[in-house]
């Protein structure tokens, strides 16, 4: 099975851009699975559409959509809609894996955001025995959030594949620069890339940006 689960240390850290960058560089057939899209109305483009816009041809699958920008379980309850359950997400990933070389499962928010009454993205990773890539922001406060995410993965016996900074500022401050050294230490996982802020602005240049910003383990050429 070639499934990679992508989570973040929180919202707006660049998960979708990182997912698109990995998809853009991956050889073979790629599927992107978004279990629950929140904060997007019917008919509007969601995260999987953004991945396809940036990465090119991928199989894009969205299991559920809720209009309010809330945690999936809360958004489903308020919409009067059924929640997405981790078992459903895992089964959808397995089905996609049968016909694709890589399946990227993008979470909503952080690792322990609830999909239903108790299930989270961590439960999806456990069910799939899949590694998890953590997307973090680069600035002050990221070390604690990244360390807690890695600790939650270890407690469940899930491999933390690495950390990627999803939106690196054009003028990084001292905290940002120090965090590049400290993130691998506090998570016990390799730093696998740093994507610049605004990476999604130009789809024509996105492949080059992805290649420059991701480490060889993810198909790029970035290194510390």
Swiss-Prot record:
Q: Which reaction does it catalyse?
A: (7R,8S)-7,8-diammoniononanoate + CO2 + ATP = (4R,5S)-dethiobiotin + ADP + phosphate + 3 H(+)
Q: Does the keyword Ligase apply?
A: yes
Where ATP binds, per the record, is at 12-17, 47, 106-109, 166-167, 196-198
Protein EC: 6.3.3.3
Q: What class of enzyme is it?
A: ligase
List the molecular function annotations (GO) for this entry: ATP binding; dethiobiotin synthase activity; magnesium ion binding
- Principal location listed in the UniProt entry: cytoplasm
Keywords of this protein's UniProt record, alphabetized? ATP-binding, Biotin biosynthesis, Cytoplasm, Ligase, Magnesium, Metal-binding, Nucleotide-binding
The UniProt entry's GO biological process terms, in alphabetical order, are:
biotin biosynthetic process
Q: In which pathway does it act?
A: Cofactor biosynthesis; biotin biosynthesis; biotin from 7,8-diaminononanoate: step 1/2
Q: Which GO terms describe its cellular component?
A: cytosol
Cell compartments where the protein resides:
Cytoplasm
- Catalytic machinery residues: 34
Residue positions annotated to bind Mg(2+) are 16, 47, 106
Q: Where does substrate bind?
A: 38
Name the coenzymes or cofactors required: Mg(2+)
Q: Which PANTHER family match?
A: DETHIOBIOTIN SYNTHETASE
Q: How does it assemble?
A: Homodimer.
What is this protein for, i.e. what is its function?
A: Catalyzes a mechanistically unusual reaction, the ATP-dependent insertion of CO2 between the N7 and N8 nitrogen atoms of 7,8-diaminopelargonic acid (DAPA, also called 7,8-diammoniononanoate) to form a ureido ring.
**Into which family does the record put it?**
Belongs to the dethiobiotin synthetase family.
Tell me what this protein is called.
Answer: ATP-dependent dethiobiotin synthetase BioD
Which species? Saccharopolyspora erythraea (strain ATCC 11635 / DSM 40517 / JCM 4748 / NBRC 13426 / NCIMB 8594 / NRRL 2338)
Q: Please spell out the taxonomic lineage of the organism that makes this protein.
A: Bacteria, Bacillati, Actinomycetota, Actinomycetes, Pseudonocardiales
Which gene does this sequence derive from? bioD
């Amino acid at each position: 099975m070639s499934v990679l689960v992508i989570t973040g240390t929180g919202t707006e850290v660049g998960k979708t851009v990182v997912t698109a960058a990995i998809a853009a560089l991956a050889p073979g057939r790629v599927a992107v699975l978004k279990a629950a899209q929140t904060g997007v109305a019917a008919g509007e483009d969601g995260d999987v559409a953004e991945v396809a816009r940036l990465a090119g041809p991928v199989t894009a699958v969205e299991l559920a959509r809720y209009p309010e920008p809330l945690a999936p379980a809360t958004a489903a309850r308020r919409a009067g809609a059924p929640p997405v359950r981790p078992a459903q997400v895992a089964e959808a990933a397995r089905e996609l894996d049968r016909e694709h070389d890589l399946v990227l499962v993008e979470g909503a928010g952080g690792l322990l955001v609830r999909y239903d009454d108790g299930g989270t993205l961590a439960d999806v990773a456990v069910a799939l025995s899949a590694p998890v890539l953590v997307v973090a922001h680069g600035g002050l406060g990221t070390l604690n959030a990244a360390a807690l995410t890695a600790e939650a993965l270890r407690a469940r016996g899930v491999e933390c594949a690495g950390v990627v900074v999803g939106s690196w500022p054009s003028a990084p401050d001292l905290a940002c620069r120090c965090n590049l050294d400290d993130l691998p230490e506090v998570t016990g996982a390799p730093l696998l890339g740093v994507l610049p802020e605004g990476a999604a602005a130009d789809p024509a240049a996105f492949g080059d940006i992805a290649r420059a910003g991701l480490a060889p383990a993810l198909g790029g050429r970035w290194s510390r």
